[in-house]
Regions:
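Amphipathic alpha-helical assembly/interaction segments
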Residues: 1-177
Length: 177
């Protein structure tokens, strides 16, 4: 049975769409050379070129971290922490992206309105990844409970072995007398 489109929950992969919005914004901004005036384009050509490459590199790294984190379905706590580290790296790279936009805006003296969409979308992406990371806490709780149950089973199996060994030892000493 299908759910009517209006009643569907928003996809948990919202950050994927957000990322491509951020990426398109970055490419658009770079293709317009950060909306700098002609004199500033000449004066700050080195900065524009350098920050353009850096912003594209950061966007590629964000995508890579999101994809790697999404490919890990944790079956153990170590996998949960690996997934979380990838999410944390993606968030850190989003902040690096924001920092690069701020550097360009301050040095080239751009009006705030020029990069506001880029900054809002990057901030929205950060919040989406944080929400994704928060929703993953159920994995941690389940994996801790599983580890606790496994430890109890292991302890009870070990106790049974010790008990069996001691009872066999007791039989051996009574047989010798």
């Amino acid at each position: 049975m299908s759910v009517p489109k209006g009643e569907r929950n928003k996809s948990k992969r919202e950050f994927d769409d957000l990322f491509f919005t951020v990426y398109r914004d970055a490419i658009d901004t770079i293709s317009h050379q950060f909306y700098a005036s002609d004199t500033k384009k000449v004066t700050y050509k080195f900065l524009i070129d350098d920050k353009s490459r850096e912003i594209l590199f950061i966007c590629d790294a964000i995508l890579r971290n999101i994809r790697v984190a999404n490919s890990i379905y944790p079956q153990a706590l170590s996998e949960y922490y690996d997934r979380r580290n990838q999410q944390n790296h993606a968030i850190g790279l989003c902040y690096a992206l924001l920092t690069n936009y701020q550097i360009v805006a301050n040095v080239i003296e751009l009006p705030e309105r020029r990069l506001i969409t880029n900054i809002e979308n990057a901030t929205h992406l950060i919040n989406a990844i944080r929400a994704w990371r928060k929703s993953d806490n159920h994995f941690k709780n389940e994996l801790k409970a599983k580890a606790k149950d496994d430890a109890k089973k292991s302890d009870s199996a070990e106790a049974q072995k010790v008990e069996k060994a001691s009872s066999e030892k007791g039989k051996d000493t009574t047989d010798k007398k």
